[in-house]
Amino acid sequence: MKTGLEIIAAERQRQIEQEGWTPEHDAEHVNDEMAIAASAYALPDYCRHIVKHYDGYPKEVSYPRGWPWDAKWWKPCPGNRIKELAKAGALIAAEIDRLMNAEMKAHGIDTEKIKTDKESE
């Protein structure tokens, strides 16, 4: 059985490989979007304030209040709290990485060189 940390790491890897949410892409989200999205997935369903609207289409779209992106990116997993918490954890990990990379760049540290050095080990 996998640990929570392993499940979160696997979800983060899936986000990068299948969704294309790379560190370079994440660097564009400078307004806490990933942390906000993580908090939405971390809340149990009964605590989410769902906004319902028609968004110009006859089909109703639902997503949590404060959701930082287009409604199409809200992908809850009803009945699977582990999967939702894995998404939340992976988004938090991505936000931590983004903040650390931004801090290193602000101090003149080349994050690409660090990544290259790690890959060659």
Each model region followed by its residue ranges:
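Intrinsically disordered, low-complexity regulatory regions
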Residues: M1-E121
